[in-house]
Amino acid sequence: MASLKGKTVHTASEAEKIIEVKQDNSQRLRLYADILFVEGSPILLSCSDPVHLLIATSLTSRTSSCTSKALNAHIAVYTQEHYTISSVLVDSESELVSMREDYARQGIRVDTAPPGQHVSVIERKIRLVKERCRAIISVLPCPLCRAVLIALVLFVVSRINLLRVMGAKASPHSWNRTSLRGALTGRKMSYSRDLRVRSLDYVQLVEPVNMSTHKTLAPRTRGGVALLPLSNSSAAVKFLLLDTGAALIRSKFTMLPMPDLVINHLTALAAADKKTVNKDPLFQYHGRSI
């Protein structure tokens, strides 16, 4: 540890080599979207057909403006890859129903599920996400605070997108022959870019060059835990800083075994959280526990 903090030298980041795969963006997609609650915190979850990509966004509130902003970000993920969203299926009680005319101007039809019949596609995906979260939590050495739990949900969604469509048979469509994310972006999954870290891996982050501290005795690294790989060309990862609790993005780091000091610190963060997180987190969909 002392060697890392004292001897680490900053080096320029190298762009990850991108291997392209065939991308089929000729078809118009249908988007399924709804809100789930993880320990009371709202998350907008969407799934597309036939690509089956999952996208999750943590919401600060359930207002129509906040929900619509998140859904627009989901749609932008597809449009930047030249896909076209033809329709969005939401629950009849969703805040997005009030924005139907706004989406109609964009050429997107907003359909609603019948009363009492929620978006079944999203309900199945929520169960899948919860199973993966529960598996990770079962082997973590400490409890989670709410912010880290939400980050874990986003991490799980990103990992699911690295898989093929389960049960998909060979077909001329690219989304049946590569990962869900690869089918969307046309870029092949890379171990060094997409699988660099696991959730809550402990690392020492390399501090960027700062002229005010470059020739001082200030530590050259800071401790943090991994939250979410961003899967971009620089192989950057989002981390939680242990000394300040702030989130930041870095591409240079050294992975280390998690010491007891860090485990105790994360346990203290969870204990100090105003709202206690259950060991088996509560996932709710329309008032029902999933």
Mark where each language-model region is.
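Surface-exposed, charged/polar loop-rich segments
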Residues: 115, 122-170
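Retroviral integrase
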Residues: 1-131, 174, 178-290
